[in-house]
UniProtKB/Swiss-Prot annotation:
Keyword presence, Membrane: no
Name the record gives this protein: Single-stranded DNA-binding protein
Molecular function in Gene Ontology: single-stranded DNA binding
Keyword line: DNA-binding
Length: 157
């Protein structure tokens, strides 16, 4: 099983669907910023929330909302419009949290307001918390660029 955390912005309002078997699924389209060298890229992920999980949060999720998603990751392949093979990332959502440490200027309040709103941010796992104050003044990128704590030869792929 491949499990991961994603931090990003919703590309659209959540979509509610029903499978052919009658199961309810809410689909979030999540844009996750990443940096490759000096180039910024956005990786698009489809996040599936099954059955009635997070029903009380769904009405508050809108296009542009910043969220933290944790769940089982899978890669799916499909044929692009031009006939070339493409890949997409899909997440079966286990944990969903609002990200009050947004880097979008229109969603930032005063520093004092952001500090108060970040006091109790957690990822939903026992003893594990996210210190969003560290990331508040940086863009939301995987690895934060040069601050990575591993050498490139340590990465197995």
């Amino acid at each position: 099983m491949l499990f991961g955390y994603l931090v990003g912005f919703l590309a659209a309002d959540p979509e509610e669907r029903m499978t052919s078997g009658g199961k309810r699924v809410v689909v979030l389209r999540l844009g996750v910023k990443s940096r490759v060298g000096s180039k910024d890229e956005t990786v698009w992920c489809r996040c599936n929330i099954w059955n009635n999980r997070y029903d009380k949060m769904i009405p508050y999720l809108k296009k542009g909302s910043s969220v933290i998603v944790a769940g089982e990751l899978s890669v799916e392949s499909y044929m692009g419009r031009d006939g070339s093979p493409q890949a997409s990332i899909s997440v079966s959502v286990d944990t969903l949290k609002f990200n009050s440490g947004s880097s979008r200027p229109e969603s930032r309040g005063s520093d004092e307001g952001r500090q108060r709103s970040n006091d109790n941010v957690s990822l939903g796992f026992e003893g594990e918390s996210l210190d969003t104050e560290i990331a508040l003044d940086k863009e939301v990128y995987a690895g934060f660029g040069e601050d990575q704590q591993y050498a490139s030869e340590d990465v197995p792929f």
